[in-house]
Design a protein with these regions (language model features):
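Helix-termination/interfacial motifs at the ends of transmembrane alpha-helices
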Residues: 2, 7-25, 127-207
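Large intracellular
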Residues: 4-7, 14-139, 210-223
């Protein structure tokens, strides 16, 4: 698990809740507002995307909670070890090696099978491009969701204000109605800035690191 992601997410919500106070939490919960912001913004995001992109985004979003990215120095050490084995015992000796990195395993497998350098570069380069596209689609989906959420929050606030102004005959109801109307704006800001946009940025960063690691593996394998 990626500890930084867990601490950041729980810490952000913890600070918001502590600012509100547990005894006041009931005043900040409104189901229609939740539906407008969370469900409404998701529906609009689906409208501008596709179901496949949504399912792919949910899948890659899980990467933000995992810490599977290897350090470049660890990859270099492993590649040096494989080079030493190949030099002493031949390429075929690499076939029995336990390789946890799927990309490196494919690169070594192609090398052992006798694939030429151009074929390895083209095949693995295409795999990198497909991976980057998949990650980009996931990051773009959450970026779009984060862009739409505040707008849906504002729509919810306007709906609440219209309903409030339509019931001005009871002055005592104006304050509570105004508070409920403003909740959708708060929900939109939280959904965008605490959840969607951080996930989008983290996916982009992880994609860049993973692509750099894959390039390193290609260079190390063909050296």
């Amino acid at each position: 698990m990626d500890i930084a992601t867990i601490i950041g997410l729980l810490g952000a919500f913890g600070l918001i809740i502590s600012a509100i106070g547990l005894d006041q939490m009931g005043a900040f919960i409104d189901i229609p507002s939740v539906n407008i912001v969370f469900a409404g913004s998701l529906m609009v995001t689906l409208f501008r995307s596709s179901l496949g992109e949504f399912l792919g985004a949910v899948k890659v979003a899980g990467k933000t909670f995992k810490n599977k990215l290897e350090k470049p120095e660890d990859l270099i050490m492993q590649l040096v070890e494989f080079a030493t084995i190949a030099r002493k015992d031949g390429m075929i000796a690499l076939e029995g090696q336990d390789i946890s990195n799927p990309f490196m395993a494919k690169a070594v497998s192609m090398l052992v099978d006798g694939s030429d350098e151009d074929m390895i570069k083209k095949t693995l380069g295409r795999d990198i491009e497909i991976m980057k596209l998949r990650h980009k689609m996931g990051a773009s989906f959450f970026a779009a969701w984060g862009e739409i959420a505040p707008a849906m929050g504002m729509i919810g606030t306007l709906v609440g204000l219209v309903l409030m102004l339509g019931n001005m005959s009871d002055p005592k109801s104006i304050g509570p109605a105004m508070a409920v109307a403003l909740l959708t704006t708060m929900y939109g800001a939280i959904l965008a800035n605490v959840i969607c946009l951080p996930i989008s940025m983290k996916l982009t960063n992880q994609s860049d690191i993973e692509a750099a690691n894959c390039d390193l593996i290609i260079e190390g394998t063909l050296f």
